[in-house]
């Protein structure tokens, strides 16, 4: 279980004086937090989530919160940070930066079908287009430079076969990233972590033609500016796979890509390099999971994710399983 930063009633009351959100009705911790301390907050004005950032600093937060605010203003269903009385989107609570955002409706769908993939694909394309005029730029902090920095530190922990795969794929990605085709790929703000547990689905309204209804995307704290195709590949590698084998499910892949491209069609270069980007998306999470597994942070109480899952996905993509 995650360790939370406790908030007393007196601290909450003092904190809420800086917001025009009404009176507090209910306040309770969310025990599933991993990176941050999260609390459900109900007031006389509505339902919100209060987040205390355990790792991100006050200097790092503006990109993420401003991006969420920008997307919400463009009718992309994301948590909308609430401004304080001084206009800031966060303040300090118990010595740590904290924010209040709107609460999305729905629950994650951990066994998605094609209908869920359609909704996610369409909204991801809308998110990409909505971010085109976002004023700030921050690169995806878990892209090639981080891989190059991290691989030498984790390679000694691996078997010869895994170390060979790790270094050979890094060489392939370095060449891909240096190519003229890669430079031509369109991009902008990306979620970069749009897994099944970062999307909510609400019950479809009676009388609508939707089988499912998207509640929204959340957890933007790995977001960054990258090639849009990378964001699509990361999403497909989670939403459209058999979790036991890493194999792609053709029906779900087709549903997601067709839906995405009804909003933003791929360029010819994107179509040519879809397989390379599926590999890049798998590699990014294999590297980060290897790092978390073999080099855990001090006082980390959470069990790290299995690195083998994304190793299987990468090997599947290398074997030509990309559809």
Curated annotation (Swiss-Prot):
Keyword ATP-binding applies: yes
Listed InterPro entries: Aminoglycoside_PTrfase, Homoserine_kinase_II, Kinase-like_dom_sf, Pseudomonas-type_ThrB
A GO biological process held by the record: threonine biosynthetic process
Listed Pfam families: APH (PF01636)
Keyword list, A-Z: Amino-acid biosynthesis, ATP-binding, Kinase, Nucleotide-binding, Threonine biosynthesis, Transferase
The UniProt record lists the keyword tRNA processing: no
Record PANTHER family: AMINOGLYCOSIDE PHOSPHOTRANSFERASE DOMAIN-CONTAINING PROTEIN, AMINOGLYCOSIDE PHOSPHOTRANSFERASE DOMAIN-CONTAINING PROTEIN-RELATED
NCBIfam families listed in its UniProt record: PRK05231.1, thrB_alt
Name listed for the protein in its UniProt record: Homoserine kinase
């Amino acid at each position: 279980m995650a360790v939370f930063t406790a908030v007393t009633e007196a601290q909450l009351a003092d904190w809420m004086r800086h917001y025009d959100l009404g009176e507090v009705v209910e306040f309770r911790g969310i025990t599933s937090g991993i990176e941050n301390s999260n609390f459900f907050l109900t007031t006389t004005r509505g339902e919100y989530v209060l987040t205390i950032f355990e790792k991100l600093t006050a200097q790092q937060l503006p990109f993420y919160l401003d991006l969420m605010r920008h997307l919400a203003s463009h009718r992309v269903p994301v948590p909308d940070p609430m401004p304080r009385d001084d206009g800031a989107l966060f303040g300090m609570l118990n010595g740590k930066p904290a924010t209040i955002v709107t609460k999305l409706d729905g629950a994650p769908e951990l066994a998605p079908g094609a209908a869920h993939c359609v909704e996610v694909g369409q909204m991801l394309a809308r998110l990409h287009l909505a971010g085109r005029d976002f004023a700030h730029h921050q690169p995806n902090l878990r892209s090639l430079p981080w891989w190059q920095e991290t691989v030498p530190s984790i390679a000694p922990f691996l078997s010869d076969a895994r170390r060979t795969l790790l270094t050979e794929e890094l060489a392939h990605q370095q060449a891909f990233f240096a190519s003229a085709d890669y430079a031509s790929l369109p991009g902008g703000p990306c979620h970069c972590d749009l897994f099944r547990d970062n999307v909510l689905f609400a019950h479809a309204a009676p009388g609508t033609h939707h089988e499912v209804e998207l509640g929204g995307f959340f957890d933007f704290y790995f977001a960054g500016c990258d090639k849009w195709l990378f964001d699509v590949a990361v999403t497909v590698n989670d939403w459209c796979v058999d979790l036991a084998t890493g194999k792609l499910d053709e029906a779900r892949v087709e549903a997601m890509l067709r839906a995405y491209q009804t909003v933003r069609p791929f360029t010819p270069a994107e179509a040519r390099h879809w397989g390379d980007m599926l590999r890049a998306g798998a590699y990014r999470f294999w590297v980060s999971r290897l790092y978390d597994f073999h080099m855990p942070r001090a006082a980390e109480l959470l069990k790290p994710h299995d690195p083998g899952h994304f190793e299987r996905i990468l090997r599947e993509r290398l074997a030509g399983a990309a559809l």
